């Protein structure tokens, strides 16, 4: 078991680039539609809720509500972009398209494929999150210098959610099961993590739950940066996101290897 699992790990530090490049070249054919699709939901939240509720709510945590909301939408866009890329694009490459099967006939291992898929999903998250951050800057909700601070956090957020979604991909029998992950995990997390309103407005039990959610850790790093404020517990938040990125990666390797060997 241990020897077989070791053989499925990444063969070296660069093989994954071939998988990333393959996905990138395929994506360039639908890049515009893909980018617009990733931006639609966060933009609706940002300008719909930001403008509508902003007029009624006023200031939240010493910031205008649209500025408060913008940071949450940056993290949310990274979450959704990496998740959807991993479940809705990776799943067919593994199954009906049999792309993974073809790649496994080369010198690449299962680990190389999974790592390449995760880095590609992280790239998609980085583009989506950065685009929303730039929109927030243009709209006057944040400063240009703040974007530089949040870029690494956007990437780490994308990697964490891509790793989590890879577990879902490994377990799901078909596309129909992805809706459970979206409605039972992603959507509640959006409202529990402080993206739309402060976590402090939640009952204490839900505040404790929010403290372990990856999106909450991401927002707690991104929001202070975009609002030009000092962030607290930086090491804790980065460490939590790293755990969400690394542990699910190895767990998904076990699950995917078991699935492909059936």
Swiss-Prot record:
Biological process annotations from GO: oligosaccharide transport
GO cellular component assignments: ATP-binding cassette (ABC) transporter complex
Presence of keyword Transferase: no
Domain ABC transmembrane type-2: 33-259
Gene Ontology MF annotations: ABC-type transporter activity
Domain of life: Bacteria
Entry keyword annotation includes Membrane: yes
Function: Part of the ABC transporter complex NodIJ involved in the export of the nodulation factors (Nod factors), the bacterial signal molecules that induce symbiosis and subsequent nodulation induction. Nod factors are LCO (lipo-chitin oligosaccharide), a modified beta-1,4-linked N-acetylglucosamine oligosaccharide. This subunit encodes the transporter.
Name the UniProt record assigns to this protein: Nodulation protein J
Gene: nodJ
């Amino acid at each position: 078991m241990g020897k077989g699992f070791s053989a499925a790990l990444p063969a070296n530090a660069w093989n994954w680039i071939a998988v990333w490049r393959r996905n990138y070249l395929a994506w360039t054919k639908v890049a515009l539609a893909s980018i617009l699709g990733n931006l639609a939901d966060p933009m609706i939240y940002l300008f719909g809720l930001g403008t509508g509720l902003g007029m009624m709510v006023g200031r939240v945590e010493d910031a205008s509500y649209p500025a408060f909301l913008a940071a949450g939408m940056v993290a949310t866009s990274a979450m959704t972009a990496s998740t959807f890329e991993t479940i809705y694009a990776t799943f067919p490459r593994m199954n009906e398209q049999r792309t993974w099967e073809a790649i496994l006939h080369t010198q690449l291992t299962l680990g190389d494929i999974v790592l390449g898929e995760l880095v590609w999903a992280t790239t998609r998250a980085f583009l989506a999150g950065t685009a929303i951050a730039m929109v927030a800057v243009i709209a006057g909700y944040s400063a240009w210098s703040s974007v530089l601070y949040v870029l690494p956090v956007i990437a780490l957020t994308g990697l964490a959610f891509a790793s989590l979604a890879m577990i879902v991909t490994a377990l799901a029998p078909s596309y129909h099961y992805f809706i459970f992950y979206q409605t039972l995990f992603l959507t509640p997390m959006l409202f529990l993590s402080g993206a739309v309103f402060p976590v402090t407005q939640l009952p204490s039990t839900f505040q404790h739950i929010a403290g372990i959610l990856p999106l909450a850790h991401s927002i707690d790093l991104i929001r202070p940066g975009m609002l030009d404020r000092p962030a607290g517990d930086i090491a804790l938040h980065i460490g939590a996101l790293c755990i969400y990125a690394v542990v699910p990666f190895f767990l998904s390797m076990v699950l995917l290897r078991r699935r492909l060997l059936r």
